[in-house]
Amino acid sequence: MGYIESNLLPDEQIVYKANLHWKIFWKSSIVVLVGIFCLAIHAILAGAATGIGLALALRAFIDYKSSEFGVTTKRVIIKVGFIRRRTLELLLRQVEAISVDQSMLGRMLGFGSLTLTGTGGVHEVFHNISSPLEFRRRIHGQAT
């Protein structure tokens, strides 16, 4: 059971859940490929590049598995981080603005950054969210 499921209020249901986009694995994949390519040049260099790539992949995997983005019938609930956890639980009626930032590549592959602004000065930015426009649409759909 995830963070969102374990923190639901009475009579609250999950309407939509999103994840981090698989783009977070690009950097590690490129470094591992460089390591494999370097096998032809130098074994130590190849081992170092592959090791760094695998470490980056492990970090991306932990980030992917430990991040939750959800819209419920009453709130927006977001949790990121494993060791250093950051959470946002914002009542739908307190959401003032939602903005989505996507590059051209982000629009083509379906990822982007989401900025939530709430009453009381809450201003949070979350990067590399899969389908951020759908996430925003679901928040608007529940808020009305």
Could you describe each region identified by the protein language model?
Residues M1-T144:
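N-terminal basic, Ser/Thr-rich segments that initiate or prime the first beta/alpha elements at protein or domain
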